[in-house]
Amino acid sequence: MSMSPTVIILACLGFFLDQSVWAHVGGQDKPFCSAWPSAVVPQGGHVTLRCHYRRGFNIFTLYKKDGVPVPELYNRIFWNSFLISPVTPAHAGTYRCRGFHPHSPTEWSAPSNPLVIMVTGLYEKPSLTARPGPTVRAGENVTLSCSSQSSFDIYHLSREGEAHELRLPAVPSINGTFQADFPLGPATHGETYRCFGSFHGSPYEWSDPSDPLPVSVTGNPSSSWPSPTEPSFKTGIARHLHAVIRYSVAIILFTILPFFLLHRWCSKKKDAAVMNQEPAGHRTVNREDSDEQDPQEVTYAQLDHCIFTQRKITGPSQRSKRPSTDTSVCIELPNAEPRALSPAHEHHSQALMGSSRETTALSQTQLASSNVPAAGI
């Protein structure tokens, strides 16, 4: 059993919307949570947490999933944004927000994406160096080393202007420090880097940043940033942009699909009208063909007439001298095919057959009278 293209398109569209577009719990979309100016905040600084929701919810509640609880978040609602100032180590952790409508207090959105806030400045800063040096040729491999006398468990490398960071475990070195080597691969263009240290027990509480390390590249530059060995979190902006693209694709499909279905319906209706008119046309053509004279049929009728005429004028004396065997004359006409005679031709043929039967009966009567002996002679 084959499925029509319309059914297949509707099934694919429903699967796409169910799997890709709607990221929801309880039938509602997720809000989007972000931090401004950055999710990496120095101790004593400030950060604004923002929630965005496309379905009209403009009142939100914010809660912290891990780390030390934040009392000012309890039973608090806010409009679109929430300012944390001054930032303390207790504010480090993962946040989510949920939206609701004031006229429908029981209708809540699904939890937003996780937003991780890192608080820096809690420990002494590490040092950052480059091998083979801070100035390299284009295409030359570069390795950045972050080290400290403190026994950090993890080092975090960030590039200026980038939201994500690279993370590697710290290992003891021969000189008594704890360090991590970040291989960047072939150098492409100059950038400025910093690194931080942290411990397993408090992964969101970082040290002071290292001194900035500018790496300059000589030669033809190109843009590249190595894939993180262990990314700490994904940027929310990229996920939000991806969701917007999927929403746009869904809207375009919903716009095009009705026109496609209307076009198919009109095409089928037009084809049905053409099929209904076609048999009448064939009948007209056949009727016109039957009215035309067929030269082969006329020739056949004239040939039979000549044969019957020849038999009529044959005398009795001649027939008595010949064997009583009728001679049939058959002439094969080229490419002759049996065809139905028109009413006029059929009437003419019946007339000829009747005339032929009368001629044959008269000839037999004359022959019988000539063979009977005269009485009284």
UniProtKB/Swiss-Prot annotation:
Extracellular topological domain: 22-242
Keyword Acyltransferase: no
Ranges in the topological domain labelled Cytoplasmic: 264-377
SUPFAM superfamilies reported in the protein's UniProt record: Immunoglobulin
Listed transmembrane segments: 243-263
GO cellular component, one term: membrane
Alphabetic keyword roster: Cell membrane, Disulfide bond, Endosome, Glycoprotein, Immunoglobulin domain, Membrane, Receptor, Repeat, Signal, Transmembrane, Transmembrane helix
Any one GO molecular-function label of the UniProt entry: MHC class Ib receptor activity
Coiled-coil regions, chain positions: none
A single GO BP: signal transduction
Tissues in which the protein is found: Expressed in decidual NK cells and innate lymphoid cell type I (ILC1). Expressed in a subset of peripheral NK cells.
Subunit composition and interactions: Interacts with peptide-bound HLA-G-B2M heterotrimeric complex. Interacts with ARRB2.
Function, in words: Receptor for non-classical major histocompatibility class Ib HLA-G molecules. Recognizes HLA-G in complex with B2M/beta-2 microglobulin and a nonamer self-peptide (peptide-bound HLA-G-B2M). In decidual NK cells, binds peptide-bound HLA-G-B2M complex and triggers NK cell senescence-associated secretory phenotype as a molecular switch to promote vascular remodeling and fetal growth in early pregnancy. May play a role in balancing tolerance and antiviral-immunity at maternal-fetal interface by keeping in check the effector functions of NK, CD8+ T cells and B cells.
Name of the protein: Killer cell immunoglobulin-like receptor 2DL4
Organism lineage: Eukaryota, Metazoa, Chordata, Craniata, Vertebrata
